[in-house]
Amino acid sequence: MDYEFKKNTLDGSYHATFSMGHEIIGRWLIEEVGKDFEKMDTILSQIGALKNSTKEWRLLGDDLSLILQDHEAIIQANYLFSEEEEDFDEDMHFYDEESVSCCGFEDFELVLQAWQAFVTRF
């Protein structure tokens, strides 16, 4: 998984670009995490606690949520949790694939630590 973080010096906004299949992680960092260091620390603590566990932990966001389970971090659009998703036609399948992404705890932990370091610096 490749990614790049940037800050717009004109308006102070952050940008997180991720490789194909992981784009939603960048959106989640921008929209749901931002510069919330307490949230980042909580997530990192949960990853550490779940590394040798079969338990699940969820962080529900406004539009996107994080699920930690089975040694994977899953970022998912909240609308996918609803039963209404079955009502979407087959043309929406590709869009759904862009609305969920997962990676292992180790990779996700590195991404979150890199984001934390980036927003601390800038």
Swiss-Prot record:
NCBIfam families: PRK05248.2-3 (NF003578). Belongs to the UPF0231 family. Pfam families: UPF0231 (PF06062). The lineage of its organism: Bacteria, Pseudomonadati, Pseudomonadota, Gammaproteobacteria, Vibrionales. It comes from the Bacteria. This is UPF0231 protein PBPRA3187. InterPro entries: UPF0231.
